[in-house]
Amino acid sequence: EDNSVNEIIDLEKSLDTISGFFKLSKILKKKNFDRVYIFNGSLRYNLIAKHAGIKSIFQYPLFTSKDIIFQTAKIFTENSIGEIVDTQPSIKSDKKKSDMIFDKNYKHIILGLSASGETKRWGVNNFVKVTNKVSREYKCKFYLAGGSSDQKIIDEFISKSESKNFFSFTNLNIKEIISIIKYADLYLGNDTGFMHISSALGVRCIGIFIDSPAYAYSGYTKNIEAIIPRGETINSTTHNTNGRDKISSDDVIKKVLEYIIS
């Protein structure tokens, strides 16, 4: 829990409508906010804030789009509060250890097999090739990061893998997941929320970017190394790159072994 967050207002779908404009404005007005920070270039939110009677409105330039999200946020925040801010995130978890036992003779690796869309997934067979090779050379335990909707992907991976030393996150809540991730040696996987959580917990991450903005989603932290499609750069790899077939399992295996050795 974060004591600096007093309340979260859920921007549910109904608030996107015309009536939702006035509903959200009414909600904000009741809070008697004296200032608002809007981390996008939305004219709608600007007008809602004004309609709610908020006097001091800090916002990105209107209609800002296709920006490097962490850079824009950093510049905006520094200009708004007059202080230098660090883009390196940090999740502070309680000191209670996980109920699981982390054998130091093993390498504990978080696997991000899924992603928010099919084109962002490197593919189960590729991960099987990597984990089979790595587990032949080192004693490894793999933690399968995913929710209940990812069960089919996780089951496919387990059925095809040589190693059977797995633990799935599908039945855990976020606090339980964090208590495990923070003791991991490495995250390997697609561009997922689990990658960003791992990074914020100080875990080294190998992120496979095949169809999402590699620099925008990895450049904010020292903990994520982006693997990008052959022929692309970290800046050119973005939405619609469709680079699944341009990242070889051999290249990823080499990178994972480098991390394990170091």
Q: What is the predicted role of each segment?
A:
Residues E1-S262:
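Catalytic machinery of carbohydrate-active enzymes
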